[in-house]
A protein has these predicted regions:
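An alpha-helical, amphipathic repeat domain used for nucleic-acid recognition
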Residues: 1-165, 172
Length: 172
């Protein structure tokens, strides 16, 4: 049994629920009424387990929706889910779920990112962008080695970037 210590509104319909002083999950207004959740009320273990299942399923669906829009790194997806008000265990379950289907793969993301931009960006720029997106430096190095991205590619990217400059742009 756990005690609801605080219910904090996120929007007109969504609320953050704190159990025993710790953030537990985000619920919709209808779920608060359906499960009779109010501040200082007690939540039985079976209701808590039921809520956890609902929230985990919701996090998985949200992860799938986020990935349908565009490819993301594991770090980016984790951040978006946390920003959406999902608890850590629901976020981890959603990450495991999408990974199990191969919908999220930082190595493939890095390969695609490098292949699509190596004509316009230097190796340093690509490396920095991928690390900023949450891809580990080991994965980035591995993908650069596999792609055989050398100095010639880097020089070509710099040359392409200079061809876009015009005289008035340089003189500004």
């Amino acid at each position: 049994m756990m005690t609801v210590t605080k219910i904090e509104p996120l929007s007109k319909t969504r609320y953050k629920v704190y159990l025993d002083g710790q953030f537990a999950f985000t619920l919709y207004k209808g779920e608060l009424s359906r499960y009779h959740i109010a501040e200082e009320s007690v939540i039985e273990d079976d209701i808590y387990d039921s809520l956890q299942q609902i929230i985990t399923k919701r996090a998985k669906l949200r992860a799938m929706h986020l990935l349908s829009d565009m490819g993301r790194t594991e770090s980016q997806l984790r951040t978006k889910l946390k920003q959406g008000g999902y608890a850590e265990d629901a976020v981890e379950a959603a990450i495991r779920y999408v990974k199990s289907f191969g919908y999220i793969n930082d190595v493939e993301y890095a390969r695609s990112f490098i292949d699509s931009r190596k004509e316009r960006k230097s190796k340093k720029e690509l490396y920095a962008a991928l690390v900023q997106k949450g891809v580990s430096s080991e994965i980035v190095e591995q993908v650069f080695e596999e792609a055989d991205y050398g100095e010639e590619d880097s020089r070509q990217a710099i040359a392409v970037s200079y061809t876009h400059l015009t005289l008035p742009t340089i003189l500004r």
